[in-house]
Curated annotation (Swiss-Prot):
Domain of life: Bacteria
Source species: Xylella fastidiosa (strain M12)
UniProt GO cellular component terms: plasma membrane
The protein's Enzyme Commission number: 3.6.5.n1
Recorded topology in the membrane: Peripheral membrane protein
Record protein name field: Elongation factor 4
One family name in Pfam for this protein: GTP_EFTU
Subcellular location as annotated: Cell inner membrane
Catalytic reactions on record: GTP + H2O = GDP + phosphate + H(+)
NCBIfam families: lepA, small_GTP
Length: 602
C-alpha cells in the first residue's frame, strides 16, 4: 500500500432501472475479485432476503468489500453497494450514494434508458459523484450498443463515448468494468477535521448482537473498545466488534477512513443508532455532524391490524425492528371501531406496502388485515387551521371544512413513440394535465402533473398494459392543490364502517359508491337476516344493495291444514328475524376491506 492509505480505496454504487442487471453484475464483480468461492456462489448473492429472490428485485441496499489486483500491479480495496431500482425504494439509493465517490450506471443495451435510470443518475450527479456508464446484456440478439449510448447522451446528458459494454450473465468484459472503477472513480478525500466521523448508512437488529450498523468512515478510525457517541441522541456506546462484508461477515482489528463496514456496540434499544446519523468518539467528538440525507416522507397510508387482538404487542415490536432496517416506514397506534387496535402505517408506495406486509407476516409470523391505502390530504378548516389527514375516517365534519387539497406529483414517462397516444389517454383519464412531450432518439418523454391518489393505486400496472410493458415511470411530489373532494362512507346495516371510508373526487363519488356496494354484496356472506349495504356522503345515501337473508322453510311440516296456522308460523319467523337483525353483527371478511382497491379507478 502507498503512504496515503485512502489512495487505493474505491467506494461505488451500482444504479439502474429494475431488471437491467445490477445484481448480476455485482455477482460477477464478487466472483472476479474472489469474494466467494465457486461453491458458495449463487445467483443474486446480495439479494439475501427471500422476498427479494422471489420477486427478482433488490429492496435493501447491500454492501460488500473486495480486494482487486489491477493491471497497474497495485492492490485496490473496492467497496460496492448494490442499490434497488424500483421507484418506491429510491430513498435507499440516495442513502447508498452518500457513502460513495462514484456510481456505475447500468443500462440494458436491448431496452435502452428507462425512467428510473434517469432519476437515480440525477441523484448521483447532484451529490457530485463520478458516473461510469455500463451497457449490459450485449449477449442478447436485440442489443444495440450504439443506440443505448445515443440515448444515454440524449436523455441523461452524460458522455457515453467511453461506456463499457459487458454481459454480466456470461461475464464477458467484466474485467474492463473493474479497470474503469479503478481509473475513473476518485479515491476518498480527507475531511477538514482530524476527529472521527462515520456516517450510518443502514442498521438492522440482531437478536444476539443488538443493533448492527453499516457505516462509512469519513475520517479517523474505529477500533473495538472505543466509546462512540451517537450525535443525534447524545448517547455513548462501547464498540464490541468491527468488520466488513466479503459478502460473508468478516471481523477486522479496525475500520479506517474511507472504508465501509459494520459496527456492533451492544445497542439493545431499537432507536439507538438512527440511519443518517454521525458516530464520533465520546472522548474527542467532532465539532458538527455530517450532512445526513433527506428525511423521506411517506406518501401512502394504510391501517395494519392483527387478526387476533392478542398479537397487538407483537405487531408493535415487529414494526419497531422493521423500522430500524427500513427508515421510510412510519407508524402510529390507531383504534378502529370495526377492527380494534392496530397501527396507521406510512409507506412510499404500493410495492413498499406489499413488501412490509409480507415481511411482517413471514419474518415475525403475524396474521394481519390491511385496510385500503390512501394518500395524505391537507384540510383547511373554517377557523383557518390547516391539518394533514392520512385517514379518511378522521376527516372533520363537512360544515367545518373550507377546502380539501390533494397531493399532485410530476411524472416523467419514457415510452416508445407508438404508444404515446395510449399514454396520453391514460393520463387524461387520471385527471392529469400535460406539461410537455420531448422526442429523444427512439424514445418519447411525456411529462404530466397527476393527482397522487390516482397514481399510487393502479397507474403503474395500467401504464405497463397500455404500452405492452415498454413504458417506464418516475415521479416526485410537487405540491398540494385544492379540489372538490368528498368522503364516501360505507354503512352496513346502518352502522358506518370506518375502515371502508374513502376520499374521492366529487365527479366520481356516485360511481365509486355504486361499484363499492355491488362488490361488497358479493363478498359479505349471507346471514339469517337481510344485510343492507349503503354508500353515503354525509347523511345523503348515494347507493344501496342488499345481501338477501337465508330462509328456513317453516311451512315444510304443514302438509295441508288451516291457513291461519301457516300465517302464525310465518309471523313468528318474521318476529325472530326482526329481533336477530337488531342484535346481529355482520362479520366482514378481509377481502371486503381490499375491495376498495379493486374498484377500477376509471
Amino acid at each position: 500500500m502507498s503512504s496515503d492509505p485512502m489512495r487505493n480505496i474505491r467506494n461505488f454504487s451500482i444504479i439502474a432501472h429494475v431488471d437491467h442487471g445490477k445484481s448480476t453484475l455485482a455477482d460477477r464483480i464478487i466472483q472476479l475479485c474472489g469474494g466467494l468461492e465457486a461453491r458458495e456462489m449463487e445467483a443474486q448473492v446480495l439479494d439475501s432476503n427471500p422476498i427479494e429472490r422471489e420477486r427478482g428485485i433488490t429492496i435493501k441496499a447491500q454492501s460488500v468489500s473486495l480486494l482487486y489486483k489491477a493491471q497497474d500491479g497495485q492492490n485496490y480495496h473496492l467497496n460496492l453497494i448494490d442499490t434497488p431500482g424500483h421507484v418506491d425504494f429510491s430513498y435507499e439509493v440516495s442513502r447508498s450514494l452518500a457513502a460513495c465517490e462514484g456510481a456505475l450506471l447500468v443500462v440494458d443495451a436491448s431496452q435502452g434508458v428507462e425512467a428510473q435510470s434517469v432519476a437515480n443518475c440525477y441523484t448521483a450527479v447532484e451529490q457530485g459523484l463520478e458516473v461510469v456508464p455500463i451497457l449490459n446484456k450485449i449477449d442478447l440478439p436485440t442489443a444495440d450498443t450504439e443506440r443505448a449510448k445515443a440515448e444515454i447522451e440524449a436523455v441523461i446528458g452524460i458522455d457515453a463515448s467511453e461506456a463499457v459494454a459487458v454481459s454480466a450473465k456470461t461475464g464477458l468484459y467484466v474485467e474492463q468494468v473493474l479497470e474503469a472503477i479503478v481509473q475513473r472513480i476518485p479515491a476518498p478525500q480527507p475531511r477538514d477535521t482530524e476527529k472521527l466521523q462515520a456516517l450510518i448508512i443502514d442498521s438492522w437488529f440482531d437478536n444476539y448482537l443488538g443493533v448492527v450498523s453499516l457505516v462509512r468512515v469519513m475520517q479517523g478510525e474505529i477500533t473495538p473498545g472505543n466509546k462512540l457517541l451517537v450525535m443525534s441522541t447524545g448517547r455513548s456506546h462501547q464498540v464490541d466488534a468491527v468488520g466488513v462484508f466479503t459478502p460473508k461477515r468478516k471481523t477486522l482489528a479496525k475500520l479506517t477512513a474511507g472504508e465501509v463496514g459494520w459496527v456492533t456496540a451492544s445497542i439493545k434499544d431499537v432507536h439507538g443508532a438512527p440511519v443518517g446519523d454521525t458516530l464520533t468518539l465520546t472522548s474527542d467528538p467532532a465539532p458538527k455532524p455530517l450532512p445526513g440525507f433527506q428525511e423521506v416522507q411517506p406518501r401512502v397510508f394504510a391501517g395494519l391490524f392483527p387478526v387476533d387482538a392478542e398479537d397487538y404487542p407483537d405487531l408493535r415490536e415487529a414494526l419497531e425492528k422493521l423500522r430500524l432496517n427500513d427508515a421510510a416506514l412510519r407508524f402510529e397506534p390507531e383504534n378502529s371501531e370495526a377492527m380494534g387496535f392496530g397501527f396507521r402505517c406510512g409507506f412510499l408506495g404500493m410495492l413498499h406496502m406489499e413488501i412490509v406486509q409480507e415481511r411482517l407476516e413471514r419474518e415475525y409470523d403475524l396474521n394481519l388485515i390491511t385496510t385500503a391505502p390512501t394518500v395524505i390530504y391537507e384540510v383547511l378548516k373554517t377557523d383557518g387551521t390547516l391539518v394533514a389527514m392520512d385517514n379518511p375516517a378522521k376527516m372533520p365534519p363537512i360544515n367545518q371544512i373550507n377546502e380539501i387539497r390533494e397531493p399532485i406529483i410530476r411524472s416523467n414517462i419514457l415510452t416508445p413513440p407508438d404508444y404515446v397516444g395510449a399514454v396520453i389517454t391514460l393520463c387524461e383519464e387520471k385527471r392529469g394535465s400535460q406539461i410537455g412531450i420531448t422526442y429523444l432518439g427512439n424514445q418519447v418523454q411525456v411529462a404530466y402533473e397527476l393527482p397522487m391518489a390516482e397514481v399510487v393505486l393502479d397507474f403503474f400496472d395500467k401504464l405497463k398494459s397500455v404500452t405492452r410493458g415498454y413504458a417506464s415511470l418516475d415521479y416526485h411530489f410537487l405540491r398540494f392543490q385544492e379540489g372538490p373532494f368528498v368522503r364516501v362512507d360505507t354503512l352496513i346495516n346502518g352502522d358506518r364502517v370506518d375502515a371502508l371510508s374513502v376520499i374521492v373526487h366529487r365527479h366520481q363519488a356516485e360511481r365509486r359508491g355504486r361499484e363499492l356496494c355491488e362488490k361488497m354484496k358479493d363478498l359479505i356472506p349471507r346471514q339469517m337476516f337481510d344485510v343492507a349495504i349503503q354508500a353515503a356522503i354525509g347523511s345523503q345515501i348515494i347507493s344501496r344493495s342488499t345481501v338477501k337473508a337465508m330462509r328456513k322453510n317453516v311451512l315444510a311440516k304443514c302438509y295441508g291444514g288451516d291457513i291461519s296456522r301457516k300465517k302464525k308460523l310465518l309471523e313468528k319467523q318474521k318476529e325472530g328475524k326482526k329481533r336477530m337483525k337488531q342484535i346481529g353483527r355482520v362479520e366482514i371478511p378481509q377481502e371486503a376491506f381490499l375491495a376498495v382497491l379493486q374498484i377500477d379507478n376509471k
